[in-house]
Regions:
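Conserved class I S-adenosyl-L-methionine
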Residues: 129-159
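Conserved catalytic loop of SAM-dependent methyltransferase domains
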Residues: 178-204, 214
Length: 261
């Protein structure tokens, strides 16, 4: 399977984060991600997709990788270095080898979100944790996107199939993963300019207090539970090496140059 083809829609998401609404969303997500990842400990952490984000910036694990479904784009500034390019439905990591996986807007732009989650569950150690970012369909932004699909005037990237938190919770439960923390945020209406987004900034506190589940974005943190197991100390092997089996970016670039040279 060609990973670039199976996840092509996510490419349109990165430029959207350069818009005023995108910058507003990105700032909120980065702040919440820093809070969540700072207190997660272990040895091996991976960010899957959207290298525009630095989701592991506040995390202190010794081994941290970022993977993506495509080669880095020279057209998108600020993208972090991608270590491995692979199909998101086939994670290039050993079974029970990762402590933390962060997926910023991966599931909603995937053709096979269930398979992506199954792969994440496979690579987790017992009590491994996943953090998932998504657009909330039950929000003013979600309503605006639904109208845009009918009128052709889209506010969010066209190809996203946004997943509600209750639905995501059901998917995770089937894989013995339990949501233990979560945040909703970005309560301003779907405005296209900084001026109007700032005018509605007062809604952040009001939204958190009065309608907390109607934020435009959510971030959930879930833990892989293993029945009958209770961890007293680290349950992983410190010497275990996580060796990505997909093709490193540098090798893919070299092969492309050789092919065209």
């Amino acid at each position: 399977m060609n990973p670039d083809a199976s996840f092509a829609p996510i490419i349109s998401l990165a430029p959207w984060f350069d818009t005023p609404a995108g910058a507003y969303a990105r700032a909120w997500e980065q702040s919440r991600l820093d809070e969540l990842t700072a207190d997660i400990f272990g040895y091996n952490a991976v960010q899957i997709g959207l290298p525009l984000f630095d989701t592991l910036a506040a995390n202190r694990m010794p081994n941290r990788w970022i993977t993506d479904s495509r080669l880095p784009s020279a057209e998108i500034s600020g993208e972090r270095q991608v270590v491995v390019v692979h199909d998101f439905t086939e994670l290039p990591f050993a079974t029970q080898s990762l402590d933390l996986v962060v997926m910023p807007h991966v599931l909603e732009f995937s053709a096979e979100p269930h398979q992506v989650l199954r792969e994440v569950e496979r690579v987790f150690i017992p009590e491994g944790q996943v953090i998932i970012c998504g657009f909330n369909p039950i929000s003013t932004w979600g309503a605006r996107q639904s109208v845009g699909r009918m009128t052709g005037a889209h506010f969010l990237p066209l190809h996203g199939e946004f997943i509600s938190v209750p639905r995501l919770k059901d998917w995770l439960k089937l894989l013995n993963m339990e949501i233990n923390r979560g945040h909703f945020g970005c309560y301003a209406p779907p405005c296209a300019t900084d001026k109007w987004l700032r005018r509605f900034s007062f809604l952040e506190k009001a939204g958190n207090r009065w309608w907390p589940y109607l934020g435009a974005l959510y971030i959930v943190q879930a833990i892989k539970r293993v029945q009958g197991m209770r961890l007293i100390g680290p349950a992983w092997d410190k010497k275990r090496a996580v060796v990505p089996s997909a093709m490193p970016v540098t090798n893919r670039m070299k092969k492309q140059r050789d092919r065209h040279g």
